[in-house]
């Protein structure tokens, strides 16, 4: 039995689909409080499967989490549940600390109480900060120091450190993966690629921060899910694994490509004031 938190979100739902197909004998339990970014209809293809269960609760609700663990006695817990939008974290950091750090602590306490084979924390390469644009030879590795830029990445880094502390202090069998920017089906349209596609299809302006020179390493979500599957089954306990796409592109080039593919004019592109503390480049060591 695997509990997948945040399974109604973008990456979590794709992971559930992957696991149901790759491991049809597994029982999958999705725990999700259905924030604005969660969509229950995404899970429609698996809702009626006998080996799937959906539970609408928050990972910050200790009683609800313990009740679920008592009922299901999971072997593996994979934590996707997170507030993940940098802009929202700049405006309202507190909810990020609550979900991303406190929620992680509640899950790990439940894992300690009920005993599990593996707890996996899904994290982000944003915990490493950013890289200079003029040094394309530099990449993030698992040894890169944590150097966060936003309240979002700080909350994820705090959770990662807590996970490693639970491993060292209590012997909890944990692994962590840090991924680059994901894209693919069921992506909530506040992030760059789905937002630009949705706006372009409706002939709305395509807002690009600053000059759009910021570089991101793009990872297809299904590739990410396969990597997590591998880590939870074969990864070494206590280790951090970076998962990258080796697919760097400037934001402006992504937007121009979307215009080209959709047959829309680049005149829709609108340059807006840059994000506060905007990271220049993310890239994971290939």
Residue ranges and their predicted role:
Residues 12-17, 43, 108, 128, ...:
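Basic, gly/Ser/Thr/Pro-rich low-complexity segments located predominantly at protein N termini
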Residues 1-182, 222:
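N-terminal Rossmann-like NAD(P)+-binding domain of SDR-like oxidoreductases, especially those catalyzing
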Residues 28, 57, 194, 200-286:
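C-terminal substrate-binding subdomain of Rossmann-fold SDR/epimerase-dehydratase oxidoreductases
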Residues 46, 134-135, 189-197, 258:
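A glycine/serine/threonine-rich, flexible loop-to-helix segment
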Residues 186:
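Conserved GTPase G-domain signal focused on the G5
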Residues 158, 162, 166, 196, ...:
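Hydrophobic alpha-helix immediately C-terminal to the catalytic Tyr-X-X-X-Lys motif of short-chain
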Residues 10, 150, 191, 195, ...:
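Amphipathic alpha-helical recognition patches that constitute DNA-binding helices
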Residues 50, 99, 133, 196-202, ...:
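A generic membrane alpha-helix/interface feature
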């Amino acid at each position: 039995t695997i509990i997948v938190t945040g399974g109604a979100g973008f990456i979590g739902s794709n992971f559930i689909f992957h696991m149901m197909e790759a491991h049809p004998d597994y029982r999958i339990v999705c725990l999700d409080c259905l924030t604005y970014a969660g969509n229950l209809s995404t899970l429609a293809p698996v809702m009626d499967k006998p080996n799937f269960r959906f539970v609408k609760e928050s990972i910050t609700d200790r009683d609800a989490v313990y009740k679920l663990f008592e009922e299901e006695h999971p072997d593996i817990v994979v934590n996707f549940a997170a507030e993940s939008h940098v802009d929202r974290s700049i405006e309202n950091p507190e909810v990020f600390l609550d979900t991303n750090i406190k929620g992680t602590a509640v899950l790990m306490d439940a894992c300690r109480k009920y005993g599990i084979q593996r707890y996996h924390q899904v994290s982000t390469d944003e915990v490493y900060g950013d890289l200079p644009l003029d040094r394309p030879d530099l990449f993030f590795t698992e040894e890169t120091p944590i150097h966060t830029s936003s309240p979002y990445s700080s909350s994820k880094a705090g959770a990662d450190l807590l996970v490693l502390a639970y491993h060292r202090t209590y012997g909890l069998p944990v692994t962590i993966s840090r991924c680059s920017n994901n894209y693919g089906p069921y992506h909530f349209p506040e992030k760059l690629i789905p937002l630009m596609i949705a706006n372009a299809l409706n002939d709305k302006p395509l807002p690009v921060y600053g000059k759009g020179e910021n570089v991101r390493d793009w990872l297809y979500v299904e590739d990410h899910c396969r990597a997590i599957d591998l880590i939870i089954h074969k990864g070494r306990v206590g280790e951090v694994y970076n998962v990258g796409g080796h697919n760097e592109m400037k934001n402006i080039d992504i937007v121009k490509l979307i215009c080209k593919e959709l047959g829309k004019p680049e005149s829709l592109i609108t340059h807006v004031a840059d994000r506060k503390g905007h990271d220049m480049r993310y890239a994971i060591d290939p």
